[in-house]
Swiss-Prot record:
Signal peptide: none
One of the Pfam families matching this protein, by short name: DUF493
Similarity comment: Belongs to the UPF0250 family.
Organism lineage string: Bacteria, Pseudomonadati, Pseudomonadota, Gammaproteobacteria, Alteromonadales
GO cellular component terms given for this protein: cytosol
Protein name: UPF0250 protein Shewana3_0990
Record-linked NCBIfam families: PRK04998.1
Gene3D superfamilies to which the protein is assigned, alphabetical: 3.30.70.260
Length: 88
C-alpha cells in the first residue's frame, strides 16, 4: 500500500474529493464512476472539465471513504484506468 498519513489527519467516514486527469475520451467519466462504484456504491455526479487545448479531461468525484486503506485503494484503482495521467 501507499505510505500516507490520512489516518492521522482525518476522521472517518468522510467525504473525500478525487480528481482524475486523463486523456480526453468520453468514456473516462464512466470508467471513473465504475471504479468508485466497486469500492463505494452510491449515486455519483462527477464534474468534468476539459483542458484549455481539449487534450485532457479532469473528472472530480466526491466519495464517502471509511479508512486510510479505502482512500489508498481508490487512488491505486483510479490510477490504473486506461488513459489516466494523474490522480489527485
Amino acid at each position: 500500500m501507499l505510505n500516507t498519513k490520512f489516518d492521522e489527519l482525518m476522521e472517518f467516514p468522510c467525504a473525500f474529493p478525487f480528481k482524475v486527469v486523463g486523456d480526453a475520451h468520453e468514456a473516462l467519466t464512466d470508467r471513473v464512476v465504475a471504479v468508485v462504484q466497486r469500492h463505494a456504491p452510491g449515486d455519483y455526479s462527477p464534474t468534468v472539465k476539459a483542458s484549455s487545448k481539449g487534450s485532457y479531461y479532469s473528472v472530480t468525484i466526491r466519495v464517502t471513504v471509511t479508512s486510510k486503506d479505502h482512500i489508498e485503494t481508490l487512488y491505486t484503482e483510479l490510477a490504473g484506468i486506461e488513459g489516466v495521467r494523474r490522480v489527485l
